Amino acid sequence: MEIAYQVGQVVIRGSLDLQQQWQDQLAQFRASRDAGFDTYCWAHHYLIDPFQHFQPFPVLARLAAEPGNMKLATSVLLLPLLNPVDVAEQVATLDHICEGRLILGLGLGYRPEECEAFGTQMSERGARHSEALELMQKLWTEDEVNHHGRFYHLTGAHPTARPYQKPYPKLWLAAMSDPAIRRVGREGHPLFIGPVQPYNTIRRQVDLYHQTLEEYGHPIPEDMVIVREFFCAENREDALDKARRGFERKYAEYSAHGFQGTDEEMTSKITGDLEALMDDTFIVGGPDECVEQIARYRDLGFNQVSIRLFYPETPQKDVMDHIELVAKDVVPGVHKL
C-alpha cells in the first residue's frame, strides 16, 4: 500500500507570514520525501476564509524541481470552477515539468462562495465536471478537437501541449455523496474518498462504486484512494490529547462556516460533535495502532492512503517531529500492507 502526504487549508489567515508559511511547507515537503512518502498532495480552494493557502499548479511546478522521484498530486482540483481548455494545457505543461510524476485529482467542490465567484451554479457542478473532463481527454489525445456540449464549445481546435504521460496523467476523482460515487463509477474512474466519511459509510460506498462499475461495464481501476485526518504519538493517550487540540480549531471553523454541497449525514458530522467525528473518521493512536487502522481500508480495496499531519497553529517543530515519527514507525508498516 502507498502513503501520501496531504496538504490542506490549515493556516489561519494572519497567524503566519505568507513567506514563512511557504518556507515551512517547503521544509515539510523535503521531510516527507525523505521519510519515504510516495506522493505529495496539494489541495485547491479559493477565498476559503479564514485560511490562507497557495494555489496548486505553481506550487507543484516548484516542487518538481526538488531532488527525488516523489509523485505530485492535486488533491483535489475543483474542475467545475475552471475552463477545461486552460486546465488541459496547464496539466500537460506541468506533467512535462514533473517528467511524468503528476497525478490529477479532481473534485466538485462544496462551497457556494467559490461557485458565485466563478459564475457557476452549485447545481451544475456534476454536469460541468463530467463535460470538462471529457473535453480535456479529447484535448490530450486528439489532433483536432470538435466539441459542442452544454457548457463548452470548440471547433477545429488544435491542442498546444500534450502530457508527458500517455495518454494523460493518472486521474483520481473525489466523491462524498452517493450520487457522486455513482458518477465516478459510471464514468469508470479511480475513486478518491475524502476525510469526513465514517468507516461504515465508506464500506457501503465502495460496494456502490463496484456495483456501478459493473453495471456500466468498467473494470475495477488500479487505484482507490482514501484521505484521513491523522495523528500519531508514542501512545494512544498522547495522540488523542494532541489530536484533539489540533483538530478542534480546524473543525470549529468548518462548523462555523458550514459544510455545503454534501449529503445530510456529512453536514451533521462536520458541524457536530468533534469527539464523535474523531471516533468515526480519523486515524489516531500509537504507531502500530495507526497502521492497523489503515489496514482496515486496505481490506476494503484501497491501495493509497493520504494523511494530513498538521493543523491550525501547530508549531513547525511539532510538524517536523510528527513527520519523523511517522517516517520511523508508520510509513514502513503501510508499505508492507
Where are each of the predicted segments found?
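Internal, glycine-rich beta/alpha segment that forms the wall or movable "lid"
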Residues: 1, 83-190, 200-207, 211-220, ...
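N-terminal beta1-alpha1-beta2 module of alpha/beta enzyme domains
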Residues: 1-66, 70-71, 166-169
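Hydrophobic faces of well-ordered beta-strands that scaffold small-molecule active sites
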Residues: 3-7, 40-42, 72-74, 102-106, ...
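An alpha-helical appendage that flanks or caps ligand/catalytic pockets
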Residues: 5-7, 123-159, 200-303, 313, ...
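Active-site mouth loops of central-metabolism enzymes
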Residues: 7-23, 77-85, 165-175, 230-233, ...
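Short, acidic/polar
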Residues: 19-31, 90, 175-182, 287-296
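Glycine-rich, proline-tolerant flexible connector loops at the mouths of alpha/beta enzymes
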Residues: 39-63, 78, 196-199, 308-320
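Alpha-helix-loop-beta-strand connector modules within alpha/beta enzyme cores
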Residues: 53-74, 128, 132, 323-337
